[in-house]
């Protein structure tokens, strides 16, 4: 026996162990490492996809917020345009109503002027007739100052 304790069995066991390690490395560790690398890559891809999804979600949310703001702005613009158009239509209608009222008032004033002139003409005719009648009465009577004043007062009263 050898003082270190190395004998043939130990060498055979060592060679068998090295062969076993070499076989395990070649047939087990290589495929296992490939599976683990594939799994690591798959997990990394999944994490990257999740990050991209998160970014896309944030981008979609931002876009949705922008679209909502644009829609609100557009709605506010439409409402403002409708209100402005309503004011324009109301002012236009009021302007037309004023024009119509002015036209009616002008027509009524013209008619009043015509009727006033007719009434004046009728009154002139009546005054002329009264003056003629009064003159005839004066000429038919013998007039003194008192009678003359009485006749004039009566004619003025009739006017």
Curated annotation (Swiss-Prot):
Membrane topology: Single-pass membrane protein
InterPro entries documented for this protein: ATP_synth_B-like_membr_sf, ATP_synth_b/b'su_bac/chlpt, ATP_synth_F0_bsu_bac, ATP_synthase_B_chain
Domain of life, source organism: Bacteria
Signal sequence coordinates: none
Entries under Pfam families matching the protein: ATP-synt_B (PF00430)
GO function term, MF aspect, one: proton-transporting ATPase activity, rotational mechanism
UniProt cross-references to SUPFAM superfamilies, sorted A to Z: F1F0 ATP synthase subunit B, membrane domain
One GO cellular component, as annotated: plasma membrane
Family: Belongs to the ATPase B chain family.
Purpose of the protein: F(1)F(0) ATP synthase produces ATP from ADP in the presence of a proton or sodium gradient. F-type ATPases consist of two structural domains, F(1) containing the extramembraneous catalytic core and F(0) containing the membrane proton channel, linked together by a central stalk and a peripheral stalk. During catalysis, ATP synthesis in the catalytic domain of F(1) is coupled via a rotary mechanism of the central stalk subunits to proton translocation. Component of the F(0) channel, it forms part of the peripheral stalk, linking F(1) to F(0).
Protein name: ATP synthase subunit b
Gene that specifies this protein: atpF
């Amino acid at each position: 026996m050898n003082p270190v304790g190395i004998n043939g069995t130990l060498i055979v066991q060592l060679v068998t162990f090295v062969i076993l390690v070499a076989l395990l490395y070649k047939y087990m560790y290589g495929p296992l490492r490939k599976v683990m690398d594939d799994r690591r890559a798959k997990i990394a891809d999944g994490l990257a996809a999740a990050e991209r999804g998160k970014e896309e979600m944030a981008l979609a949310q931002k876009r949705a917020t922008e679209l909502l703001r644009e829609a609100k702005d557009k709605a506010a613009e439409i409402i403002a345009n409708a209100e402005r158009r309503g004011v324009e239509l109301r002012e236009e209608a009021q302007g037309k109503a004023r024009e119509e009222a002015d036209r009616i008032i002008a027509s009524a004033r013209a008619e009043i002027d015509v009727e006033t002139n007719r009434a004046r003409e009728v009154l002139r005719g009546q005054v002329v007739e009264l003056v003629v009648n009064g003159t005839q009465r004066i000429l038919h009577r013998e007039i003194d100052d008192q009678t003359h004043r009485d006749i004039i007062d009566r004619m003025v009263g009739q006017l």
